[in-house]
Amino acid sequence: MIFDKNYITSALLPRIRGLWLSSQDTFPDFLSPVSLEEKRNNEAWVTAAMERLQRHMKAFPSRSRIAVRLPFSRKQPEQAAYSQSPAPQLQKWTQEMESLFHGLLFDEPILGICRAMSEDSLTAFQASMKDFLRQVRSFAPEMKPEDMGQALRNFMVYSIFREQNGLPQDCPSSIFGYSMLYPFTDNFLDDPKHTSEEKKHFNLLIHHKISGLPITLLSLHEEKTAQLLADIFAVYPSPESVASYGEASGKDIRQGLLLMLEAQEISQKQADASLFLTERNIMDISIYKGGLSVLIDRFFINLKMTEEEILFYFGFGFLLQLCDDLQDIGEDKGNGSRTLLSSCLTPKETAARVNRLFSYTAGLFDLCPCRNPAFRDFLLQNCHELILTSAAGSGSWFDEAYLKKLEE
């Protein structure tokens, strides 16, 4: 089983920890320089794209205008009823969002996704995202735009893995359920408005649902969370998962989700001021949570993995977790959450961590499956850009000289 806890904690986690600790913390000399003209053109494109995206997200129709689907289960559409006809404003908003996606995929000049993927692949990629958004709109019309974006990002990781492994795009109920779980669970647990007792009940409910035990639902939010888990279990095990992972594939994904729940619970310690955490404690929490999250994403594409591939995807999750933490330095410092980035005491120390992140990324991609070299290069460049933009978003925690060096 891939999600054997002893395997995760005794084999994968120590190797990723070792890769991180062995990575250099000096400024990377492998970043490609960008000419001043190209930089200005890129900045202008990014600024315009972000302004359009932000305006569009702010124009999200108010919840009072959005049709509420009853019941919300996507599994039995013939039983669904609507409290009113779908709001025209929401339909228009979704169409415009699809147009924005098209521009981002086909016109984006920086990362070169149009050079890494064929036109047919890009079209399929866009279609799968549209399908995902339609399912989100049907399942949770009340969802905030930022939470919708979070779920979409989770789904895009899965879609990228399918492209990386030469598989056609799709949007099965399992990956819909898993992509939506993060905004439904992690955000609930991070929200200080919920009491510790509410969070304990919520975690217990999830644990029981994954384990196949009876559950008591106290709210619509809990009911929808249970439905998302049911969407996953509805297709596991399947002939494809059994062929890829063996007869225990259904048990394996349940174990993976239980470990992910445990990782979310452990991560709450980062904000508990009464607990003493060493740098290694903080590091291991981030590796465990980030690594499991992405390894589960990869599991859902139903394609057998080598030991090296498992290690890459687990390490890739840690990379994405660190990018999140890099972007959230100010917020994490404000609420007392200790991460490898927020725990830095000086701008120099923070810069060294970012340098190490670049070096770690380079070392990790030596393990990257290489069925499509152009797509691998695109993915690596995307990671570099993610680190750069995350650092820029937390610019107040760096020296100006370091930020200027990154900009070059």
Model-derived regions: residue spans:
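Accessory, usually C-terminal, subdomains that scaffold auxiliary metal cofactors
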Residues: 340-348
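Long, compositionally biased intrinsically disordered regions
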Residues: 358-362, 391-408
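All-alpha helical catalytic cores of prenyl diphosphate-utilizing isoprenoid enzymes
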Residues: 109-181, 187-188, 192-330, 390-391, ...
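Amphipathic alpha-helical protein-interaction segments
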Residues: 21-28, 38, 45-83, 172-180, ...
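Intrinsically disordered, low-structural-confidence terminal and linker regions
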Residues: 1-43
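A short, conserved beta-to-alpha structural element at the edge of catalytic cores
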Residues: 213-217, 348-366
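Low-complexity, highly charged intrinsically disordered N-terminal segments
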Residues: 74-127
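C-terminal anion-handling pockets and recognition modules
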Residues: 368-391
